[in-house]
Amino acid sequence: MELKTPLYDAHVKAGGKIVEFGGYLLPVQYETGVIKEHMAVRTQAGLFDVSHMGEVLCEGKDALANLNQILTNDFTNMVDGQARYSPMCNEHGGTVDDLIVYKKSDEYYFIVVNAANKDKDYQWMLRHQFGEVTFKDVSSGYAQLALQGPKAMQILKKLTAEENIPKKYYHAVFDTEVAGIPCIISKTGYTGEDGVELYLASEKAEEMWNTLLEAGKEEGLIPCGLGARDTLRMEAAMPLYGHEMNDDITPLETGLKFAVKMAKNDFIGKSALEEKGTPSIKRIGLKVTGRGIIREHQDVYVGDKKIGHTTSGTHCPYLGYPIAMALVDADSVEIGDTVEADVRGRRVAAEVVALPFYKREK
């Protein structure tokens, strides 16, 4: 059965084109269209409904030990209010999911997982828990809104005191409020822009949504759908589960070495990653130089030799040209090399470029 977020009716009323994603009915775009929504986030501000994401509480004396065992990153030195990104590996080193962990206190962590994986992730956590710890799926009680763009903070400051807003990226303020609505304010996002993600009670979602849109009118804030969220994350070269990673692809192959702490005593998948050694494949960026757009699942060649396949691809509104990401043989190409993708039997040329494609000016 397809699920609806608390904002479903608001999306329909606003002219959102509804599609299924991760088991949920969500707007892929509004009447403004993907390009305008994308550009609003790069130049002004956009508001996304991300309530399909899953939330899990991890509580207890052994919460930290459990996180360090189940996840690849190290959570030992986190301070209260800090957030940390991490892959979660299976015993073979493949990626179960990628997620964000927020620390509220030594015995209380708030975990945010991908929508399509939330049941799988929760069961994985329960299966591997040990000691004094409780994992609790609280997804149904939460809505998540993402306010993103260079003017996001300007808008937010109209609705809450500055001390309620995290100063640093990947930090959060718990038990705070925006426009009198209780929430968690997190300085995170999936767009490559400045901004926040707000976690709040589901029943308050529509009130918060309308309040933010009204407050941001002067700054050009508009609602944005999944289409713009995807093109924005591609420009920022952020991996998406099911594309750049899955149960068979390791986080090291995806280029997430920064979030895999091999110096830790142990974690699920560590021995498999050690056995594999240096990754045999790598994620690369492609700037399309030929005619056409390279989408996902296209074979990539150097001459007649197939070296891998694309995982995501689109035309980027802000950059003004098509891009793609691909997983290829690790020693096959370097930055500056030319490759070709097979697009429905036709070869389309592309240059290997450094990731990310887009990085905002600080």
PLM regions: where:
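Membrane-targeting and insertion segments and their boundary/processing signals
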Residues: 37-41, 92-95, 99, 179-186
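Acidic active-site catalytic centers that drive phospho-/nucleotidyl reactions
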Residues: 49, 98, 197
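Internal amphipathic helical hairpin motif
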Residues: 61-95, 153-181
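Well-ordered mid-protein domain cores that form the structural environment of catalytic cofactors
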Residues: 74-128
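Conserved, structured C-terminal
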Residues: 1-16, 20-22, 26-30, 105-362
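Acidic, proline/glycine-enriched N-terminal capping motif
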Residues: 1-86, 94, 227
